[in-house]
Amino acid sequence: MAKRLERDGQPNRSLRIPAERWRFRIRGLVQGVGYRAGCCRRAQELGLAGWVRNCSDGSVEVQAEGDEQRLTELRVWCEGGPPGARVDSVDGSRVATTGADWFEIRPNHFQGGALTR
């Protein structure tokens, strides 16, 4: 991450908020209800980078990168989901940042390497 320097040569930490990357696994009735599209839309509104995809076990996986406040707002959205979804749980963890600068819907991820849309 680029750092801006003050006149004394020290970094000005107030100019850049360090990014974090969070991973969520959402379980419940979350496939076939517009969950990925809604999540992508909300993440883009929040200015987050990352992706969302369906998993073979019926869950949805999200990885999002940005500041902690906006990531928390996305998690709150994930806990409710779009109309028609029934969220039973949202498990989250921090993962390494990637420096991505967009949010996308990724192809479905199924164990064994098979990918579908």
From Swiss-Prot:
It catalyses: an acyl phosphate + H2O = a carboxylate + phosphate + H(+). It is an enzyme of class 3 (hydrolase). GO terms for molecular function: acylphosphatase activity. The keyword Hydrolase applies. Pfam families: Acylphosphatase (PF00708). The active site is at R36, N54. Keywords: Hydrolase. Residues 21-107 form the Acylphosphatase-like domain. Disulfide bonds: none annotated. Its EC number is 3.6.1.7. The keyword Hydrolase applies. SUPFAM superfamilies: Acylphosphatase/BLUF domain-like. Belongs to the acylphosphatase family. This is Acylphosphatase. It comes from Synechococcus sp. (strain RCC307). The lineage of its organism: Bacteria, Bacillati, Cyanobacteriota, Cyanophyceae, Synechococcales.
